[in-house]
């Protein structure tokens, strides 16, 4: 008795299923990495203000950062403004994450504008 070859449609379904699950994994990783990069950047910027009395002119002015911090800082766009700073997340893991934080998160921070802020 001859074994039948797998149907092409089954193969297509498997490939599509894998593709869709990979997209979900990427979106989840973008969220997780984007969140971590944003919070790390905020912490480093706010620490700079505590130490030196003002926000840095650029992210290159941050002192005593670690190698992993550079990954986070490379995922955000920073601009110092008169009354604080603007901080946007430009990259999560691969793509741009869609994040939001409650009003309480922003209290006491110098972030005056962000693509993560409502």
Question: Where do the model's predicted regions map?
Answer:
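C-terminal motif of bacterial Sec signal peptides marking the signal peptidase cleavage site
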Residues: 20-22
């Amino acid at each position: 008795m001859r074994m039948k070859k797998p149907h092409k449609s089954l193969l297509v379904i498997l490939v599509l299923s894998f593709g869709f699950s990979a997209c979900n994994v990427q979106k989840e990783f973008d969220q997780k990495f984007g969140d971590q990069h944003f919070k790390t950047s905020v912490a480093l910027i706010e620490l700079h203000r505590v130490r030196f009395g003002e926000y840095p002119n650029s992210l290159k002015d941050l002192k005593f950062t670690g190698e992993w911090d550079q990954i986070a800082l490379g995922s955000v766009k920073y601009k110092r403004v008169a009354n604080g700073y603007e901080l946007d997340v430009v990259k999560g893991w691969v793509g741009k994450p869609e994040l939001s934080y409650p009003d309480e998160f922003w209290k006491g921070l110098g972030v005056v504008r962000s693509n993560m802020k409502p």
